[in-house]
Amino acid sequence: MPQITLVFISLSGNTLSFVKRLSLYLADNYDYHVKQINIKDLKHETFPVKEEFVAILPTYLEGGNGVDSGEAEILTTPLGEFIAAHGNAQRCLGIIGSGNKNFNHQYCLTAKQYAKRFGFPLLGDFELRGTPDDISRLAQVIMEASSRHSSNDTQTLPNS
């Protein structure tokens, strides 16, 4: 059974709810085993992630509008520290952001910042707890990212 790891942080429960539903969907529809790592449970510990993973990050920013102020991440920095440690960023297939669209420019801004900072793609986004459509859409995106990564690992150089 193929495996994918989801590395995330959940503070209010929205992201945890999404990850649980996404994990069930991946297991039921793609026969994937999903390993979940909730950074909140680690209490600032880091360790090397040996397998490919997808990061999922809610948006928590200081006040402002996300354009000329309010771009500084708060509360979720342990996820960034975890990704930065032990070369974990190199095994990250990409990031999925969550947020509240009422915050306009700040919506998923932290995930966009992580994508730029670490050089991996922003795979998608969902609002609040996410909808069933978000689950199926992002599961497909994860499967495609995992498949691309697996293809790159198995390619061999032609004989010289």
UniProtKB/Swiss-Prot annotation:
SUPFAM superfamilies from the UniProt entry: Flavoproteins (SSF52218)
Disulfide bonds: none
Signal peptide coordinates: none
One Pfam family it belongs to: Flavodoxin_NdrI
InterPro entries cross-referenced by the UniProt entry: Flavoprotein-like_sf, RNR_NrdI
GO molecular function: FMN binding
GO BP term, pick one: protein modification process
Family in the record: Belongs to the NrdI family.
Record protein name field: Putative NrdI-like protein
Lineage of the organism: Bacteria, Bacillati, Bacillota, Bacilli, Lactobacillales
